[in-house]
Amino acid sequence: MKKRLLALLLALVMVVGVMAGCSKKGTSDTPGTSATEPGSKPSADKLSQPEKATVTAKYAYKAEFKDITAQFEWINQICAAGNSVYLSASILGEEVTETDEVTGETYTYNNYRDGLFRLDMETGEATELENFVMPEIPEGWQGGTNVYHMQAAPDGTLWMLVNFYTYRYNVPEDFDPATDQEYNYYEQGEEKSSLLHVAADGSLIAELNIQPERSEEQQYYNSISTFCVDTAGNVYAGDWQYVYVFDATGKQLFMLDCSENGGSLCQMNSDTVGIATYVYDEATQTGGQRFLPIDLATQDFGEAIKLPQNAYNFFPGDDVYDLYFDNNGNIFGYDLETQTQEKVVDWIECDINSNDMNGYAILPDGRVVAFLRHWDSAAGESTTQMVTLTRVDASSLPEKTAITLACMWLDWDLREKIVDFNKTSERYRIVVKDYSEYNTEDDYTAGMTKLNTEILSGKVPDLFLLNDQMPVDLYAGKGVIADLYQFIDNDETLSRESFVQPLLRALEKDGKLYEMPTSFYIQTAFGLNKVVGDYETWTLADLKDAMTKLQPDATVFNVYNTKSDMLQQCIARNIGAFVDWTTATVSFDSPEFIALLEFANSFPAEFDWENYNWQEDDNTQARLNSGKQLLSLVSFSTFEDYLYQCYGYDSGIRFVGYPSEDGTSNNSFYTQTGFAISAVSACQDAAWAFVREQLLGQKQQVENQSIWCFPVMQDAFDRMLEKAMTPEYQYDENGEIMYDENGEPLKWPKMTYGGGVSIAPDGTETQMESVEIYELSQADADVILDLIENTHSVYSYDQDIMNIITDEVAAFFAGEKSAEDTAAMVQSRVNLYVQEQS
């Protein structure tokens, strides 16, 4: 079995090789590799990309998809026993109709039950094993039973963890529903966890009651969710906070406390069971993910073993890897001795969207069986598919050119779109290289360092999925990424006017566009109109003048904003004012940066979160309205978000942003899911085809309410605004608009502000007024559009530059150095850094 599993995993790794990216024949099989010497700094002419994909593996996996015809709603658990695959699934039961004893209204709902199924691998037909019977709820009680975990035994039988709970409302004979509630008579009944040993036909072999013995303080943790069985028959059950160990008869041997961090029960091999948990070492003041083996002899945890910091959902190891784990939708193997990890299963390479996965199993013959549950929003229904991965000769698969996408974590929405692109494209497929997989608990930037090192050596990916860590300006200045206007200008459908113009202008660098986000939100600051509304400029002098209108002890922002907070936020919102990667120049010795330092220095050095005496009126709205605070930092991503955050302020508000030396409002865009294309890729047109796919469907996403930020496409943005300004009416069962007693149509509020009960420190309760907002007004729309029109910068964070600044300003914040001397040192060090990188 171990050898077969190893062969399977190694062959799955080879899928990546089969789909290798655009590398020229005869060169390295690493996607996007050139012949530049390692460690050298390439010029644009040295950066090269491939012409065609190269087949580098003998074997690959072919995915076969089949619809599951069984009448169950969803799959709970899956495991393989021999060549059979078993499913624990929820089945739609009978429809129940009940009548409310108080109102007389009737309502219906469906019951569900758990069933055990055996799957026919050839047809996809799932047959329910009717010999399997779940524990029944006693008459007169309510409750439920759930299969939490399944594990196959070597002899083809199954172990199943079943949790059972009951309750009832034991109302008296004279119970009157008009004056009393049945919830006053709630009684909790029997609650237990059982381990069922089940034969291949579903019949019960044995049942072990593994109800733990707990103290009164431990009763809170009463839901065992997983188990392991070792070769001696000992059972290990866990509920995150505790691990309970039983012998083969179900007798509890001992219990272990997983500490305040909790622990996930996992089995490293047939005889080694323990927990994965976070451990902090006081001596070294370091911490990380650790495996704590359970020692049966000492009835305690053994010596901690280091695990990858991004490891979750563990699987037993074999003769190659000590254990396997999930990370970002893929499976990795881990070697404890060398403390190294390797990706062994990449679902995207098999055209499988792991977002939809219910579970998978590995068969002895090397096949992999996975189950996908996909919701079709158009049809309003979900479907279940079985996917069988079968090893085939790589040469039998259609050859496609690979587009290598570099990222620092792949979000779930984009994963689905990549799978769809790979399935439908006859010529290309996207190969994802997630550099976050190289991060360690000691170095969370190791992946970013590796990506930049590869770029410097000439290995440039075709496509970048951007995030805050990626230095886009540096890439643009070095000629690594392309001007996207060349693709937009030659596009048959799109033009520059297809996009939200203020955002594009803010993203431009010397008239060129190097990144394309799919959505954005606004970051700014506002104050009360009666306080900041009359200023024609917004400089530090203006801010200081506005502070004189407030209470003597008023703060600029909330009490918890510190010097370092303000410095980082101000620089990230406008770093382009101080660093120009195109010309490799910096200007930190400018009056603007000196003024920024002085502004940041006006805030407290730190904030004592633990000992601060919080008051009821410490919320931002109350502080602004009462004159205790000048400005509120705000980010909003939709028109409704604006309504939620910006209503309820005395005299209205005005967006002024951060103060600046030129007096303009310092607002910024924060972009989401941004793309950049390699300047030297041979797959530029195909890469752009994928990017434009993410843009063209945005208007439909607005209709479906499946986009959560302002869209970058102008037509989608306009439709989002139109929907926000359009009221939503209430309809009756005939589809007709409902009206109130005054003949006015009834609307659904887009937002409800206030309401509820306010409790003062002395216990006094005050009913708060509730305000419902039904649509965005034209005046509010004009405010938002004006704010977007007057936003000229994009939030950008360069960790290396920020580290230099943080290091140098420490003495200034401590009063040991002047702002001018600090600015001069920052100028010198950042200038040296920029020259080294250019």
Please tell me what each predicted stretch does.
Residues E733-V830:
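C-terminal capping/gating helix-and-loop segments adjacent to ligand/active sites or protein-protein/ligand interfaces
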Residues Y475-G479, Y485, V500-K544, Y560-T585, ...:
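Periplasmic solute-binding protein
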Residues I224-S225, N452-I455, P461-D462, D491-K530, ...:
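A structural signal for short loop-to-beta-strand junctions that line the ligand-binding cleft
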Residues Y485-S498, G576-E598, G657-N667, G815:
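Short, solvent-exposed loop/beta-turn-alpha elements that line the ligand-binding surface or hinge
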Residues S23-K24, D29-A81, V85-N110, G115-F117, ...:
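Conserved N-terminal structural module of periplasmic/extracytoplasmic solute-binding proteins
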Residues T583-D617, L643-Y644, S651-Y658:
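Glycine-centered hinge/linker elements that transmit conformational signals in sensory
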Residues R429-F499, E508, Q621-N625, L630-L631, ...:
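Extracytoplasmic "Venus flytrap"/periplasmic binding protein-like
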Residues C646-Y731, P745-L746, N790:
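Extracytoplasmic/periplasmic substrate-recognition and gating elements
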